[in-house]
């Protein structure tokens, strides 16, 4: 049975994502970050030649926060009702990450450069996994 609380629903584990820790000298780093308000997309250009565009919804769904990821295996929470979420602000955190402030009030979780890069490389797989979990839960992005 799924319980509804503040537009979120508990689910089984999300795909494993890159660890937040330990940038190495060879870790890709962004050379440009642009927020496209109208399209609700964040564009990141990395020094390894990759450029990724993320919908704000995708970044909200895959927030690295404990609120979304949980504090251990099996505690992940499926994010529902995020289709129209936007990003209100981006706060740098040292030289390794940013904190995103979403229009729905979510503002926890640090997005490291490694985490962004992993999300970009595997974006299609992660998105399809999210849609499958939504379907299985009978939940809506609206």
What are these regions (language model features)?
Residues 2-142:
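Motif-centric detector for short Cys/His coordination patterns
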């Amino acid at each position: 049975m799924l319980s509804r609380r503040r537009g979120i629903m508990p689910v089984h584990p999300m795909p494993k994502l890159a660890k937040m820790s330990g940038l190495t000298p060879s870790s890709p780093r962004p050379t440009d970050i642009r927020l496209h308000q109208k399209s609700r997309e964040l564009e990141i250009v990395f020094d390894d030649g990759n450029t990724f565009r993320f919908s704000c919804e995708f970044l909200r769904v895959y927030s690295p926060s404990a609120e979304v990821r949980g504090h251990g295996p099996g505690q992940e929470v499926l994010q529902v009702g995020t289709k129209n979420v936007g990003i209100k602000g981006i706060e740098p955190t040292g030289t390794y990450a940013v904190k995103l402030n979403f229009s729905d009030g979510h503002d926890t979780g640090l997005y490291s450069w490694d985490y962004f890069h992993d999300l970009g490389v595997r974006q299609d797989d992660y998105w399809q996994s999210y849609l499958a979990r939504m379907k299985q839960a009978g939940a809506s992005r609206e």
